[in-house]
Amino acid sequence: MEELQDVQLTEIKPLLTDKDPGQHFEDFDGQEHDIETALGVVHVTMSGNTRGNRPVLLTYHDIGLNHKSCFNSFFNFDDMHEITQHFAVCHIDAPGQQQGAPSFPTGYQYPTMDELAEMLTAVLTHLNLRSIIGIGVGAGAYVLSRFALNNPLLVEGLVLLNIDPCAKGWIDWAASKLSFWTTNVVEVVLGHLFGYEELQSSLDLVQTFRLHIAQDINQDNLELFVNSYNSRKDLEIERPVFGSSTPTNTTIKCPVLLVVGDNSPAVDAVVECNSRLDPTRTTLLKMADCGGLPQVVQPGKLAEAIKYFVQGMGYMPSASMTRLVRSRTHSASSSGSMEIPRSRSHTSNAQLKSSSNNSLSNQIQETPQTIELSC
């Protein structure tokens, strides 16, 4: 078996190094909507114009965040402009999580995670959106996955960061309940967003998000959202059995790009999700030297990966191929799934220089793989 060789990436744009990343939370130009659904009101920010039959990029944030703190530094990054000039963007804020949201009345029943997914149908209908490419983080990745399972014709692709497809077990559920009694919700959320190493070393970044969660997010509403996420059901997705005459209806039908940082607390959950998805439509991207917020810490690399992913779907054919040095990786298992470097797969080299015409997007569509980004 050949030794795995790490993918190297030439960094042209600097990573987010500002001591106050919160300055990047400012919103870009967009039209805000409060959309009534049968399950409550959804706050939506729409940017750009829809283009014929082209899908819209639809984002959904994680617990403790809203669309501004989760995605604005990413979508304001220069490299993302090459993508957003081709697509309209629709940012979803989970109920009560937008900046300045009032508290829900006493006794309010917050939507379940499945109901949050149902609410997206009304959003698409209201905005006359025909299909989406979803970009979700954590809880938002779960919501978009559930939506894709229920509405496969409306979802052309998914970029899922830090997804956990599993329901919490009784022990984990009890531990999360206990943590609310012994720890404030801000610290609970920080433990979800950041790995132990980040909490100890990335003090400026963690403090920025600590202040944001404590000051910009309604604490009562946040606790309801966290409880909803912790009470989620298992997605019950199953990897298709190749050669079987009975197709499974419990798998995501569209192409999926799974993303996780190697220091993220969600690594094991993302690998578990990868093992359940169709390997012919799924790519697992693990970022080295990155924790729980790849879109904040490594925006250039994530933007490049999304560009290749979207090109593999047949969009943006003329966009430039600039930075990645690629390594074509093949599955070491008979099922075709890829594992993260803790369980090394074998690799054959195929370098992509900036002058090369070869596209990683073709590789993404051809075979399941793990791409390890190093900086």
Swiss-Prot record:
GO BP term, example: signal transduction
Gene Ontology annotations for the cellular component aspect, listed alphabetically: cytoplasm
Gene3D superfamilies recorded: alpha/beta hydrolase (3.40.50.1820)
Disulfide bonds: none
Record's compositionally biased regions (Polar residues): 364-375
Ranges annotated as spanning the membrane: none
Low complexity bias: start-end ranges: 348-363
Region (Disordered) location: 326-375
A Pfam family annotated for this UniProt entry: Ndr
PANTHER family in the cross-refs: N-MYC DOWNSTREAM REGULATED
Family: Belongs to the NDRG family.
Name of the protein this chain belongs to: Protein NDRG3
The species this protein was found in: Xenopus laevis (African clawed frog)
